[in-house]
From Swiss-Prot:
Pfam family name, one: Ribosomal_L18p
Gene behind this protein: rplR
PANTHER family for the chain: 39S RIBOSOMAL PROTEIN L18, MITOCHONDRIAL, LARGE RIBOSOMAL SUBUNIT PROTEIN UL18M
Species this protein is from: Sulfurovum sp. (strain NBC37-1)
NCBIfam families: L18_bact (TIGR00060)
A molecular function GO annotation: 5S rRNA binding
Role this protein plays: This is one of the proteins that bind and probably mediate the attachment of the 5S RNA into the large ribosomal subunit, where it forms part of the central protuberance.
Protein name: Large ribosomal subunit protein uL18
Leader sequence residues: none
Entry similarity comment: Belongs to the universal ribosomal protein uL18 family.
Domain of life of the native organism: Bacteria
BP GO terms, sorted: translation
Lineage, highest ranks first: Bacteria, Pseudomonadati, Campylobacterota, Epsilonproteobacteria, Campylobacterales
Record-linked Gene3D superfamilies: 3.30.420.100
Amino acid sequence: MLKSIQKRKNKLRAQRKARVKGKIFGTAELPRLTVYKSNKHFYAQAIDDNAGATLASADGRKLGLGANREDVKKVAAEMAKNLASANIETVVFDRNGYLYHGVVASFADALREAGIKF
């Protein structure tokens, strides 16, 4: 039963991701900031889709953090620092099919508080 629930959740997330994928595009001047969350960790990266390159990233696993709201705020602070070192002030936020709720919303709010615009 639990596996079928998880399969349905993953299928719905994939549908949301596919629906949005054609509308969001990142460049070197305005990169796409995408997030990924697992049950244990939270990851984020700024991507230039023209070059297919990652411009900045933050990894909660490397920082020894979990995937709760308080730890995600620390990942957002690290991401803001990495974006500032790459001279990036504005990004296009790609929630990667996740609902804008919980840790994804906390991450976005913490990035805005750190001065990143989107």
